[in-house]
């Protein structure tokens, strides 16, 4: 299972939000490029970037910072937050991002996402951010009545690379991932699912291995790394390539 460290950008500073609340911001690094290089040095095989300003406003506020990070790293970088047009997505891909993550447009303009996936095979990810099973959009400010699993199944034949499933209620809390919602998302999707939200310790990462047989292929970790609750090198040894643990072959979790 791939462990993907996260850098959330707000005014070009590395921060974390609590449950997506822009009023509950913790600043972790004034130098996101240095932070990105640190994660790469510790063994990260991919970096997850979120433009929080873009997610909220739809404007590319942190582009210079994103470009600097992408240029500095030798590992693939994926970006989400405010990517809402075909032109914007392909602009980002053209200057070095490996993948772009589409959230709001996945629910508002699903055909645009499908078009992008066809034009850019393997480079389009759908981000599904949900609270109580319902999809949230526009930086989690707007709540829809669309079921997260229904949205996932809508993209099964679209050619997207993966779905990032974020549980807003656990994001930034360190209280553990929502295994039930992840299992439901993996069952609804025919593409790999990447877990996001709630990881607070090594035991949480190990618990995700039980979902690997269902299609959960990776996990995004943010606050737990910054708070020192999880050591990236140890986490990679525990559940990454070459790990000692194997995912369960039985299906002990909820049916």
Swiss-Prot record:
| Name listed for the protein in its UniProt record | 1-(5-phosphoribosyl)-5-[(5-phosphoribosylamino)methylideneamino] imidazole-4-carboxamide isomerase
Q: Which family does it belong to?
A: Belongs to the HisA/HisF family.
* An MF annotation (GO) of this entry: 1-(5-phosphoribosyl)-5-[(5-phosphoribosylamino)methylideneamino]imidazole-4-carboxamide isomerase activity
Enumerate the UniProt keywords alphabetically: Amino-acid biosynthesis, Cytoplasm, Histidine biosynthesis, Isomerase
Q: In which pathway does it act?
A: Amino-acid biosynthesis; L-histidine biosynthesis; L-histidine from 5-phospho-alpha-D-ribose 1-diphosphate: step 4/9
What gene makes this protein? hisA
What organism is listed for this UniProt entry? Prochlorococcus marinus (strain MIT 9313)
Q: Name one GO biological process term.
A: L-tryptophan biosynthetic process
In the UniProt record, which is one GO cellular component term? cytoplasm
**Which NCBIfam families does its entry note?**
1-(5-phosphoribosyl)-5-[(5-phosphoribosylamino)methylideneamino]imidazole-4-carboxamide isomerase, PRK13585.1
Which CDD domains does the record match to this protein? HisA
| Pfam name, any one | His_biosynth
The EC designation for this entry is 5.3.1.16
Q: Which reaction does it catalyse?
A: 1-(5-phospho-beta-D-ribosyl)-5-[(5-phospho-beta-D-ribosylamino)methylideneamino]imidazole-4-carboxamide = 5-[(5-phospho-1-deoxy-D-ribulos-1-ylimino)methylamino]-1-(5-phospho-beta-D-ribosyl)imidazole-4-carboxamide
**PANTHER family tied to this protein:** 1-(5-PHOSPHORIBOSYL)-5-[(5-PHOSPHORIBOSYLAMINO)METHYLIDENEAMINO] IMIDAZOLE-4-CARBOXAMIDE ISOMERASE
Q: Where in the cell is it found?
A: Cytoplasm
The active site is formed by 8, 129
């Amino acid at each position: 299972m791939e462990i993907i460290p996260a850098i959330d950008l707000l005014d070009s500073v590395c921060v974390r939000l609590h449950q997506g609340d822009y009023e509950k911001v913790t600043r972790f690094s004034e130098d996101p490029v240095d932070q990105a290089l640190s994660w790469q040095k510790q063994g990260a095989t991919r970096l997850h970037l979120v433009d929080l300003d873009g997610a909220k406003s739809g404007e590319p506020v942190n582009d210079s910072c994103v470009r600097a990070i992408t240029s500095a790293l030798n590992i693939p970088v994926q970006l989400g937050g405010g990517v809402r047009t075909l032109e914007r997505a392909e602009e980002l891909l053209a200057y070095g991002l490996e993948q772009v993550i589409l959230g709001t447009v996945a629910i508002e303009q699903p055909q645009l996402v499908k078009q992008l996936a066809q034009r850019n095979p393997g480079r389009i990810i759908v981000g599904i951010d949900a609270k109580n099973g319902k999809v949230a959009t526009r930086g989690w400010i707007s709540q829809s009545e669309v079921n997260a699993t229904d949205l996932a199944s809508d993209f099964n034949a679209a050619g997207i690379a993966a779905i990032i499933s974020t549980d807003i209620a656990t994001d930034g809390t360190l209280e553990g991932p929502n295994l039930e919602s992840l299992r439901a998302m993996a069952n609804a999707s025919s593409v790999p699912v990447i877990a996001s939200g709630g990881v607070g310790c090594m035991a949480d990462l190990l618990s995700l291995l039980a979902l690997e047989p269902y299609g959960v292929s990776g996990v995004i970790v943010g606050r737990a790394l910054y708070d020192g609750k999880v050591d990236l090198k140890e986490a990679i040894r525990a559940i990454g390539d070459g790990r000692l643990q194997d995912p369960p072959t039985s299906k002990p979790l909820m049916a």
